[in-house]
Amino acid sequence: MKTLISYFLAILLTVSITPLEVFAGETERIEFEDGSYFTIQIEESGARASGTKTGTKTYTYNSSSGTALWKATVRRTFTYNGSSATCTASSCDVTIYNSDWYVVSKSASKNGNSATASVTMGQKILGITASKKTASLKLTCDTNGNLS
């Protein structure tokens, strides 16, 4: 009985101290002629030895004054083992901060070690669509669990 309890405690201790990595990559910026811009950020998390990594890539659309108007986030889960990587789950979400904006279209797909999403947003002024912006998001995992 003592051996069983010791074994159980050893497993519990091993599981509870497995480090979980959370990494927020550098923020990239894409500017438009009117002064508005996208900020793009990749975040990833996953236990080092688990062979599973969850990543998000977020495009935030900002006005020329720096106000966030909406964001599109693609979230993917990958498995990897040093010789291959596969996207196992995916989702795409849109958060709207300014009520002038609405979702025109949204799609997501996964294929092998990559996942893509496309979000087109429209802006209505006085009930008429005045502009549209599209965010094309692609997230890829290499065989070592590195996201790009």
Region roles according to the model:
Residues 1-67:
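N-terminal prepro-regions of secreted/extracellular proteins
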Residues 44-148:
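Mature secreted bioactive peptide module from preproproteins
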